[in-house]
Amino acid sequence: MAVFTPSYPLTFPTVSGVRTQRFSLVRTVAVSSSPFTGQDQVVQHEGEYWTTQISFPPMLKDKAAQIIAFLLQLRGRRGTFSIGDQDRKTIQGVATGTIRVNGASQTGNQVALDGFANSTNNVFKAGDYIQINSFLYMVTEDVTSNSSGEANVKIEPALRQGIETIADDATVVYSNTKTIMRLDSNETAWDTDQVSKYGISLSATEAL
């Protein structure tokens, strides 16, 4: 018996667009409050990851079949797919051309980049997404390049230390940015009504 395994991550289907999307960043923060003083002890752990919940618009069976086939190929939580914030596929900033990582083995909530136009304001703006390797980050402050086309870019979440290797000159994606996710459930289900309109939704978490 031949066993076919899809090549993951799968490409997210575009046959219908999405009706609604919730996109969120989850952090692992422990808070312990003293019962005597009321003071908090706060510890932020390394775990940070994107999640999404998507609802597709009502559709007839020809389009629904393509969405369902995509979901079934994921085989529950086994497979992965690429997706980003569907309402933020382009940046607000003025960056053009090829932007690259400026220096290897970077860590933390700031990444040095180069390849910008020299001495330019707002090459990225707060709220823009960038993608390094297969991981997604949001720029948290407007960015101005220096006279050499370099800039230090503040981001959330922090660079994925221990998961991702940041190589010097790695290309930075800033259009149609994505990360890799897997479904939150092993069940694949859909609804239909009396006129064969399909209702399909999914929930997924970044695959780290």
Each predicted region: which residue ranges?
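Extracellular/virion structural assembly segments
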Residues: M1-L208
